[in-house]
Amino acid sequence: MYDVSGRGGVARSVVNLANRLADHRDVRVVSLHRPSARSTYELDPRVSLEVLVDAAAASPLDRLRRRRPTALRPVPAEKHMTRLTDRALRRRLASLEPGVLVSTRPSLHLAAVRWAAPGVRLVGQDHKNFSTRFAGPRQPEVLREAVPRLDAYVVLTHADAEDYHRELPGLTTRVEVIRNALPWAPAEAPAPLASKVVVAAGRLANEKGFGRLLEAFAPVARDHRDWQLHIYGEGPQRGALTEKVRRLGLDDQVRLPGYTDDFRGVLAGAATYAMTSRAEGFPMVLIEALSVGLPLVAMDCPRGPGEIVRDGKNGFLVDDCDIAGFGDALRTLVEDDELRRDCGRQALADSHRYTADAVLADWLTLLDDL
């Protein structure tokens, strides 16, 4: 993976999986970088960590290599991949002993199929949806070379699996659907849902669509002055979102608290979870909301929400980009306490599909079959 110390969903899901696999396998996490000495997500002591590039200990020649883009073509230029990481990756992959290597990004899939030692079984794990991957610069070329040479390719939704088979006719690589697991066990009882707080979370960036959420919430907020919207996270759109809150007259009803170290507690204290992302891979926040019995309102963006939200059962699934429809669904849960509680009970029941044990069983089956 690129960076085990990151705050993002990839780091979280990798650490969760590694920790669970440690009960059954010898596990090592190999991180290209580790810019922060303190990781957001804690590895089990039985999981060994190896960092390939130590920026602090770089020689003058290594610093020069770090400024030059990767030679691993057709990987596009990106900050994580440089001549320095090329050198470290090639050496480490060539020295691997027989076992299973799981790579987490298209560029790492390509490095694995080109440079891994003989006898290593190769599994690619994708944390983004097919449409996003194939829209990126040069990524289709990378995937068209790498995926057919992998032993298995793990995607997050059935729709993504179908897309890969359609895009790569005759593909013999085993394409497996394995969802990300909950980082904690489901609650014993649903949240009380009495707080009159709608919660959302994610990077404050365009792809998360929080501007759409503010527009959908505004008419509901005008009719229900005792309800609030709390959007957790940080990112480049904080200023723009703050200004939009002001323009919509929502200063007293919308908060942007930043990051929280107790996201489960935040969810358990809310009444509804809202998602208006423009694209997702498999949104962890939705299954985390399910796990405390929180009803969902989500736009059916590509991909993920459509395979998690059961419309009218554990919440409401709204057509992508339908801001008015999203506001109507939100209003329904705000105004109907009994429906909100019914959806919350179903949400908690549905969360058991994503427990660590359920997802671990899928991974162990795959690893045993390779």
Locate the predicted segments by residue.
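Short hydrophobic beta-strand element within catalytic cores of glycosyltransferases
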Residues: 295-299
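A short, well-ordered alpha-helix in the C-terminal region of glycosyltransferases
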Residues: 325, 332, 339-353, 362-365
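Carbohydrate-associated surface elements
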Residues: 159, 181
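Short His-centered aromatic/hydrophobic patch
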Residues: 82-85, 103-109, 126
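Conserved acidic donor-binding segment of nucleotide-sugar-dependent glycosyltransferases
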Residues: 310-312, 316-324, 331-337
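A conserved mid-protein helix/loop that constitutes part of the nucleotide-sugar donor-binding site
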Residues: 8-16, 196, 200-225, 229, ...
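N-terminal strand-loop element at the rim of the active site
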Residues: 1-7, 20, 24-76
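Aromatic "clamp/platform" in nucleotide-sugar-dependent glycosyltransferases that forms part
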Residues: 259, 278
